[in-house]
Amino acid sequence: LDRSSAASDVYKRQLYNMAGKDRALADAICAAVKESAPGAVLLALSGSEMVKAVQAIGLPVANEVFADRGYRPDGSLVPRGTPDAMIEDEDEAIARVIRMVTEGKVTANDGTDIAIQADSVCVHGDGPKALAFVEKIGAALQAAGVELKAF
């Protein structure tokens, strides 16, 4: 097992995506969290099986949306390495975040609008412009009248 940071990130990402689709896995994760950290707020892909599992077990959940990722019509993320997986244009990504937060909608990669709940916005922090991007998103959300707060 490769325990490097990059490999660890891949495994976490895979587990996150798997738990978003597999209710039994999501239930197992929630049970472990409830036992070890009962006050923790779990982040889960908006509308996913993980959100349903967290709600069912009675833990606090934050529906997570992604600023710079494409969505499929079923609400899952477009897999990395495929067309439409990443939103490269910052202005487009910011506009999508504003719409997700204020209207509860995002346009999927087939052009349809899907319902989404945005309690938390994920921004990938591995790029050189990540902090500036987060600051722009925060300013745009505040300009749209959205209150930013910790949970």
Model-derived features with residue positions:
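Single conserved hydrophobic/aromatic residue that forms the stacking wall/gate
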Residues: 1-7, 11
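Alpha-helix-loop-beta-strand connector modules within alpha/beta enzyme cores
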Residues: 28-38
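Charged helix-capping and loop-helix junction motifs
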Residues: 22-28
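C-terminal helical cap(s) of enzyme catalytic domains, especially alpha/beta-barrels
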Residues: 130-148
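Active-site rim beta-loop-alpha module in soluble metabolic enzymes
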Residues: 47-105
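Catalytic beta/alpha-barrel core
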Residues: 18, 37-46
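C-terminal active-site rim and adjoining tail of enzyme catalytic domains
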Residues: 97, 101-134
